[in-house]
């Protein structure tokens, strides 16, 4: 969140924008950034967008799940789905404070029965595969159109 906040102007070009989709947070968790620091950064990002693009809808996606299987430990590192869900709850609460922000819960659409990122949907336990992105895009369709 900190890096996006620092470089937000580089990602937004000043033209008319209908919707902005934010999918951020997993790198903060991987770097052990405190949730309050990430929330402060996220709120600053939302406020900056709301100030510069007052008619733009902001879609805040839930942080995606990881697969905590042993074969993925090196990539997933310290991320856990329990921590991700805690952050997602905090994201949802933050989003509810802003009329222009809608929280988009996509976490469950990517998990298996054990609550892990489905192996078919990941390349390394953290990043999505083509199949994972297809499921994500299907989950987003109702929120974007």
Language model regions located:
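Sec-exported extracytoplasmic/periplasmic mature domains
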Residues: 9, 13-16, 25, 43, ...
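Generic hydrophobic/packing signal
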Residues: 17, 39, 57-61, 128, ...
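Catalytic His-Asp segment of secreted/periplasmic serine-dependent ester chemistry enzymes
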Residues: 66-145
């Amino acid at each position: 969140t900190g890096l996006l906040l620092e470089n937000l102007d580089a990602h937004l070009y000043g033209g008319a924008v209908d919707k902005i989709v934010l999918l951020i947070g997993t790198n903060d968790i991987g770097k052990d950034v405190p949730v309050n620091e990430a929330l402060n950064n996220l709120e600053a990002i939302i406020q900056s967008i709301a100030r510069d693009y007052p008619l733009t809808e902001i879609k805040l996606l839930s942080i995606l799940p990881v697969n905590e299987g042993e074969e993925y430990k090196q990539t997933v590192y310290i991320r856990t789905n329990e921590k991700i869900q805690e952050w997602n709850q905090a994201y949802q609460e933050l989003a509810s404070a802003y009329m222009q922000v809608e929280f988009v819960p996509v976490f469950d659409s990517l998990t298996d029965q054990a609550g892990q990122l489905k192996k078919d949907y990941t390349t390394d336990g953290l990043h999505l595969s083509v199949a994972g992105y297809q499921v994500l895009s299907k989950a987003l369709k109702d929120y974007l159109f």
